């Protein structure tokens, strides 16, 4: 469960990080990106561990709220799944079509960005 939460928070952070304050951005980058503990972040910013905990929880809630309203991450996932399905279908039914294969590689590369 923890791995899924970390993946989700990192993904939401990638999409909505620019909407966060500098402090929120820094705390989440250290906590999720660099795997700092609450105590290490508290020491780094000269605040209490509880202050860091509260800030991170509020920021997580903000990220979830952004996703609830904008759906950028959900749309990204759906788009990637659709492209994967299309690529799989084309490889199965049109394995010798080099032009189609090249086009699908380009589409897959664009959706991965």
Swiss-Prot record:
Pfam families: UPF0122. Gene3D superfamilies: Winged helix-like DNA-binding domain superfamily/Winged helix DNA-binding domain. It comes from the Bacteria. InterPro entries: RNA_pol_sigma_r3/r4-like (IPR013324), UPF0122 (IPR007394), UPF0122_fam_protein (IPR054831), WH-like_DNA-bd_sf (IPR036388). NCBIfam families: PRK00118.1-4, PRK00118.1-6, YlxM. HAMAP family: UPF0122. Might take part in the signal recognition particle (SRP) pathway. This is inferred from the conservation of its genetic proximity to ftsY/ffh. May be a regulatory protein. Belongs to the UPF0122 family. This is UPF0122 protein LSEI_1603.
């Amino acid at each position: 469960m923890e791995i899924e939460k970390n993946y989700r928070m990192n993904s939401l952070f990638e999409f909505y990080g620019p909407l966060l304050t500098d402090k929120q951005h820094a705390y989440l980058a250290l906590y999720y990106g660099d795997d700092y503990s609450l105590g290490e972040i508290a020491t780094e910013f000269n605040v209490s561990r509880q202050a860091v905990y509260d800030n991170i929880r509020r920021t997580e809630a903000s990220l979830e709220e952004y996703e609830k309203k904008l759906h950028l991450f959900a749309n990204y996932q759906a788009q990637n799944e659709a492209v994967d399905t299309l690529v799989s279908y084309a490889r199965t039914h049109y394995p010798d079509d080099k032009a189609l294969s090249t086009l699908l590689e380009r589409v897959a590369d664009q959706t991965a960005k």
